[in-house]
Swiss-Prot record:
Ligand binding (Mn(2+)): D120
Residues the record lists as Phosphoserine modifications: S3, S9
GO biological processes: dolichol metabolic process; dolichol phosphate mannose biosynthetic process; dolichol-linked oligosaccharide biosynthetic process; GDP-mannose metabolic process; GPI anchor biosynthetic process; protein mannosylation; protein N-linked glycosylation via asparagine; protein O-linked mannosylation
Binding residues annotated for GDP-alpha-D-mannose, in chain numbering: P32, Y34, E36, I63, D65, D118, A119, D120, R147, R234, K240
Gene: DPM1
Protein's recorded name: Dolichol-phosphate mannosyltransferase subunit 1
SUPFAM superfamilies: Nucleotide-diphospho-sugar transferases
Quaternary data: Component of the dolichol-phosphate mannose (DPM) synthase complex composed of DPM1, DPM2 and DPM3; within the complex, directly interacts with DPM3. This interaction stabilizes DPM1.
Residues where N-acetylalanine is found: A2
EC number(s) given by UniProt: 2.4.1.83
Organism of this sequence: Homo sapiens
Amino acid sequence: MASLEVSRSPRRSRRELEVRSPRQNKYSVLLPTYNERENLPLIVWLLVKSFSESGINYEIIIIDDGSPDGTRDVAEQLEKIYGSDRILLRPREKKLGLGTAYIHGMKHATGNYIIIMDADLSHHPKFIPEFIRKQKEGNFDIVSGTRYKGNGGVYGWDLKRKIISRGANFLTQILLRPGASDLTGSFRLYRKEVLEKLIEKCVSKGYVFQMEMIVRARQLNYTIGEVPISFVDRVYGESKLGGNEIVSFLKGLLTLFATT
């Protein structure tokens, strides 16, 4: 009697399984907020619309840092409207920094991918399906939105702020040579474990934090894909970029140059 031979397929790596079984993936959006009462309902509605139309499994985690304008009250209402399985409010008592906001949010995230973005409508959720497609095409560890590549751009800024932004990006390219076109942007998709590792390594605060994340990613040989995005100045509220932030950015840039 001929023996029966059972062929066994080789064990697939986690990354192969993620690429071949996209419906099993879940995307956790981290939304740090401070005085975003007017913007929050619209950005959440746009996120829900984009994910629902694309058939993407998601959750939105709102990390409010003690906003005095009632942002937390709005977030509580959104949690009731969309359900606590989709909208998770995880507030803190005061402003404690962007990096710690991400750490706090990730503690509650159940997705295997993390999306970070601004809550002020500067980043449109319509680009998220493109981020996900890009990640799958190249099996990237990180996908970053870029204002400085392809048809990406900035809208609503005056000439002064455009010059500051371009100048800052030019300096970072010259000094750090990161291999990515937009270091100061904050619209990105990460594998959850990659973001956890990067936050462990990063020491910067404020606007330099996002820049260091990309620099450290290159040091750790993580792969980075880019998607051109349109960045639009905030619809409601005042910009949080001022003179102190610019000085802090320059100090942080020089520190990274000296230590990386």
